[in-house]
Amino acid sequence: MLRDFSVQSLFMGVLIAFVGFASSFAVVLHGLTGVGANEAQAASGLMALSISMGVCAILVSTVTRLPVSIAWSTPGAALLASSGVVEGGFNAAVGAFLVCGLLIIIAGLWKPLGRIVSAIPPALANAMLAGVLLSLCFAPVKAIAFNPLFGLPIVLAWAVVGSVSRLYAVPAALIAFVLVVALGIDMPEGALAGLSAALVPQAEFVSPSFSASALISIALPLFIVTMASQNIPGIAVLKVNDYHPDPGPLFATTGLFTLLSAPFGGHAVNLAAITAAMCAGSDSHPDRARRYWSSINAGIAYVVFGLLAGAVTTFVSLAPSVLIEAVAGLALIGAFSSSAVAAFTNAETREAAAITFLVTASGVGFAGVSGAFWGLVAGGLMLALARSAKGKG
């Protein structure tokens, strides 16, 4: 196994971890605080997720000898940001994370549930995701309106670097954010001391509680979004690169690591979609049989980044929240545009997808349940009625 290691896979692994962490950690923090986490709990959740996905990547790639890339659920974090605090607060959200992990395990081991997830029309799943992401993608505009001197550098860095390489667009925006905070924000007394103290990793256990509203508003939509937007595309990327793993055990393993991270604030661990292509492609290594080391190296780097989560969260908290939300919004624009296109491409499902999108994007909940769930229900009913009428005709 050690003979398969290469410097090329080392550099690619570190790059994968940097891109994966830097491009979406802001979304994770925004999502966790959106469902009631305080700063310490959000830092703990970020650390738990990063370490869990790192260990998961190392374990899976070592056992299978396949370049399986692992990530946290960025669309799932975006869903959390739009869900709001449910009855029971963050404890209830953690209970929902546990249920989501259990559902992912069942989907991997029990094929009927996996088939049910696969039976959800892709147009509706994408419309729900696009509806969740819409309000978050407004954040860059709001940041510019809040303070052009702070917001514009972040957006311009993303746009200029993105015109050359989409891969580095969000990391460039993140660097601009760091410079804005360091040079433009008045640091409170003791800020540097606080950053130094935050370098010591601190996991915070959150006792889970369970409520019907949290299960329906968070657990079910999080499970659907994670499976439809991360796990299933992750398998597809591997197949495109001529790797053919059994999906079930991979899904179940990510579900297990979701269960392990949830009590410390982590929402979902899953197969990666974007960085999966980096792991499995020829840039990872010319020899297909040796590319799995890129995933192992990425896993090691994720663990290191996870140990720095407290310092990252403390630094982010020094700036107005709208600025880090702008970075998160920029990170989600690509996901929003691809989801919107996929939702409205098929004429047969377009109207039902529009209903799903609008109900979800409205952010309006009923009976303590978020709009994401009701959007999927409304779109599903619309599609069923349309197909029923067409069948009778």
What is the meaning of each model-derived region?
Residues 1-43, 171-247:
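Helix-loop-helix hairpins and the membrane-proximal interhelical loops
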Residues 2-6, 30-59, 220-292:
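Membrane-embedded helical hairpins/re-entrant loop segments and their flanking transmembrane helices
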Residues 40-42, 48, 56-113:
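Membrane helical hairpin/interfacial module
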Residues 16-18, 56-68, 257-267, 363-367:
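Transmembrane alpha-helix interface/packing and boundary motifs in multi-pass membrane proteins
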Residues 87-191, 297-393:
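Membrane-embedded alpha-helical modules
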Residues 13-16, 38-44, 61-67, 117-123, ...:
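Short, amphipathic, aromatic/basic-enriched membrane-interface segments that mark the entry/exit
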